[in-house]
Design a protein with these regions (language model features):
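PLP-dependent amino-acid enzyme catalytic core
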Residues: 1-318
Length: 318
């Protein structure tokens, strides 16, 4: 990932906190009868794409002599921040919902980070951390823009792996939008530098049980809509009030993309199908594949489509 050093916001090489993350495989698979490419980001050190953002954010923190960080997460971002903080020799405390998968809690604790369980939803966790964050470096994957400058490397890698060209569409999960916004930033930068001549359509996938962005998009609203949320097995995108909602909606609209909702049984089915091909992915990643299956039926047969396995199945109890 740090091969794109000149495009990443860290000044000194000695500040870089890395575990040789990045350059994950771009796997060609047949989904819904169509050949597509899937970025296998389960191969990251902690098992999810969030390592992209954590590496850059913790490197930035190290460059500014930060000794202790806090973060709130539904799991994967907490694992990543905990791992990279540990590697940097920083103290770390992660706030998570009490419904977080035990495997993710075990992983966070293994990195010698403190885990604080918060009763309620992902949004309750975000509110809980604000008091602590006022006294510590808040290594937020949502609020801190340096995290997004890590996830933008997804776009750089895809472009390079495709022979320095842009795909027609990128299908990604969206909750707080850390990967989606990274994709938008990355391809915008590539276009600005003349590397590619267009930004791909961004296709955003949400669970129908928690789809404030999908509902807003369908009603042509610039902001996520308040609505009744039901439980979803795709805990990584179970975000009732995405704080970057307006930015996410704008990014999808500007790319001429769209939102797709998937049902719980479709998520389970996609996960089982991928496991049958040897890919053990978590429910959030399975939701993405379920959305991908829907998208290919409406896209041009000539379109070059890229998606992602965003997290490993070993990170979930379900």
């Amino acid at each position: 990932m740090w091969r794109y050093r000149e495009a990443l916001p860290v000044e000194f090489d000695c500040s870089i906190v890395s575990m040789s993350e990045g350059c994950t495989a771009l796997v060609e698979e047949v989904i819904g009868g169509r050949s597509v490419f899937i970025k296998n980001d389960t191969l990251f050190p902690t098992g999810s794409f969030k390592d992209r953002g954590a590496s850059v954010l913790i490197s930035y923190a190290r460059e500014h002599s930060v000794k202790s960080v806090v973060e709130d997460s539904s799991g994967n971002a907490g694992c990543s921040i905990a791992a990279y903080a540990s590697r940097a020799g920083m103290r770390c405390e992660i706030f998570v919902p009490d419904s977080t998968s035990q495997s993710k809690l075990n992983q966070i604790a293994a990195y010698n980070s403190r885990v604080k369980l918060v009763k309620g939803s992902r949004d309750d966790v975000a509110r809980e951390i604000l008091e602590t964050a006022s006294m510590e470096f808040y290594a937020s994957h949502v609020y801190n823009p340096f995290f997004l400058h890590g996830t933008k490397t997804f776009a750089f890698e895809v472009c390079e792996q495709l022979g320095w060209k842009s795909p027609d569409a990128v299908v990604v999960p969206v909750g707080n939008g850390t990967l989606l916004l990274g994709v938008a930033i990355g391809f915008d930068e590539l276009r600005s530098e003349g590397v590619v001549n267009r930004v791909p359509k961004i296709i955003a996938v949400q669970s129908k049980n928690c789809s404030p962005l999908l509902q807003a998009f369908n009603k042509k609203s610039d902001l996520p809509l308040p609505l009744k949320i039901e439980k979803t097995i795709a805990e990584g995108i179970a975000i009732e009030r995405p704080v970057r909602g307006a930015q996410i909606l704008k990014a999808v609209t500007r790319s001429n993309g769209t939102f797709i909702g998937v049902a719980e049984d479709e998520i389970v089915e996609a996960g089982i199908e991928m496991a049958g091909r040897g890919f053990f992915i978590e429910p959030t990643a399975a939701a993405t594949i379920a959305g991908l299956k829907k998208y290919v039926t409406s896209s041009s047969s000539h379109d070059l489509i890229v998606s992602v396995f965003s997290g490993h199945g070993l990170k979930t109890d379900r």
